[in-house]
Amino acid sequence: MALIYIVEDDKNISEIESFSLKNAGHQTVEFPDGRSFYKELAEKKPDLILLDIMLPDEDGLSILRKIREKRETKRIPVIMVTAKTTEIDKVKGLDNGADDYMTKPFGVMELVS
């Protein structure tokens, strides 16, 4: 069982992600913004982070760069899960350190795998 942090401001999407991952045997914690995510990340490190790009308080790419800059978090796998679907967006995500890039809408089987 993995601990997965979901950073997503759309409650419907975060609930789908969380429900699907919990059904696959994982533990999840949902965060609607960067501020609440940083607070928890300082306390406990997850096995995986699912990160949206368009968040209310801070761009997901900025959050990703901060994750990669810190010694204690730089090795945590991060998957961008976003509505930004262009090739340029995907390249930006991967160039900034994302381990993978999924676009919305996504399939539950794709998410769980």
Protein language model features and the residues they cover:
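C-terminal output helix
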Residues: 106-113
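Short hydrophobic/Thr-rich beta-strand motif most characteristic of the beta2 strand and flanking loop
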Residues: 25-34, 40-41
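Active-site residues of response regulator receiver
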Residues: 52, 82
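Two-component/phosphorelay signaling modules centered on CheY-like receiver
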Residues: 10-29
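The feature encodes the CheY-like receiver
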Residues: 14, 56, 86, 104
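His-Asp phosphorelay/catalytic-motif detector in bacterial-type signaling
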Residues: 45-47, 72-77
